[in-house]
Design a protein with these regions (language model features):
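Glycine/alanine-rich phosphate-binding loops at beta-alpha junctions
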Residues: 48
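Residue-level detector of Asp-centered blade-edge/turn motifs that repeat once per structural unit
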Residues: 25-27, 65-66, 109-110, 155-156, ...
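Beta-strand-rich domains and repeat architectures in extracellular enzymes and scaffolds
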Residues: 14-43
Length: 230
């Protein structure tokens, strides 16, 4: 994702474009945010195309497993909700309608549900839980009762790798090399057996967990130099 984002950045360079954010990959495309809108390009970063154009901010694009759809969050109507649109472009469909902010996090492995984070059932506004909503709409379902800010489901949907703590501030990756009691770990929960596995956690920032086969990968600054993949 980083390489493709850099390639796209090079493609935009002749136009003086900067700050391409939140990249997500499908088999053939790269989605990213630029200027508060959702864009896609070829996987190699060429042929960028703008999918959304609205005064409100659109962010957190995530491809469906088959790459045909993009789920994203948007602040239309002065509220942040979950939306769905074809990855080739077209009209967006609103999936959530709650007054709390709903931020897209990913997809269920079968591509039938969008996973999002929300504080809708939390007394304070500084914590989130993970929910799912069907792509055809309907009532949202909570993945678990525990606080979670982001997570990724295993291929069979039985386990969730997630970050239970917020970052040191509300940005996407926290303060660089922050150390202290609030540094977030990555945990794995078996949703059927309700068994929790805590990945050994130094005093470091660890986030963005994802599954690759039976293994969980995540970003961490535990080597005290920069953020790397572990």
């Amino acid at each position: 994702a980083l390489f493709c984002a850099l390639a796209t950045s090079s493609a935009f360079a002749s136009q003086g474009t900067a700050l391409l954010r939140q990249p997500d990959l499908s088999a053939n495309q790269l989605a990213f945010v630029y200027g508060g809108d959702i864009w896609v390009s070829d996987k190699n970063g060429q042929n960028p195309r703008q999918l959304t154009s609205h005064p409100a901010s659109e962010f957190a694009p995530k491809f469906s497993p088959d790459g045909k759809w993009i789920a994203f969050s948007a602040s239309y109507d002065n509220n942040t909700d979950v939306y769905l649109m074809p990855s080739s472009g077209g009209a967006a469909t609103r999936l959530t309608f709650h007054p709390s902010a709903d931020t897209v996090n990913g997809w269920s492995p079968d591509g039938k549900k969008v996973i999002f984070a929300s504080n809708r059932e939390i007394a304070n506004s500084r914590s989130n839980q993970l929910f799912s909503v069907h792509v055809e709409g309907g009532f949202e379902q909570k993945l678990m009762e525990a606080v979670a800010f982001e997570g990724d489901l295993s291929a069979d949907g039985k386990k969730l790798a997630y970050r239970p703590n917020n970052m040191a501030y509300s940005g996407p990756s926290g303060w660089r090399l922050h150390r202290g009691g609030s540094t977030p770990p990555v945990w794995i929960i078996d949703l059927e057996k309700q068994q929790l596995e805590k990945i050994p956690h130094p005093n470091a920032n660890e986030f963005s967990p994802f599954w690759l086969g039976d293994d969980v990968y995540f970003l961490s600054d535990r080597d005290n130099t920069a953020v790397n993949l572990f």
